[in-house]
Structures are given as C-alpha cells and as structure tokens.
Amino acid sequence: MAPQLTFGAILQEAREHKGMEVGTAARRLRIRPDILRAIEAEDFSRMPPRGYTRNMINAYARLVGLN
C-alpha cells in the first residue's frame, strides 16, 4: 500500500512540478518564504493564526494549480 501524501507534501510536489522555487512562490503570493516552508513542512508552530494560515494555503494551492 502506497503511503498517503500530506497536504504540505502535495503543495511542495505541485510547486516543484511547475519548476517554481520557494522564493518565487513567496514573491507571487506576498508571503514570507519561511512561512511557505512551514506550510510545506506542516509546522503549525511557525504559522500565523488559523484564519490567515487557511487563506495562505488556499492561495498557495491556487498558485500551483490545485483546487
């Protein structure tokens, strides 16, 4: 049975598939690169409050072509 990917891994894989660096994604989203890395690592301790994080994740998913 194949291991299930987490949402952070899915976002990272989609970004890499588009050939996009974290810095590029951060500039386009106007989000700090360390926050994008925290999203990909699912490190909730480094993320802003839940409402902001949810909006950032949604914007990131749209940027990399995920719904």
Question: What are these language model-derived features?
Answer:
Residues 1-67:
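Cytosolic/nucleoplasmic/matrix-facing N-terminal domains/tails
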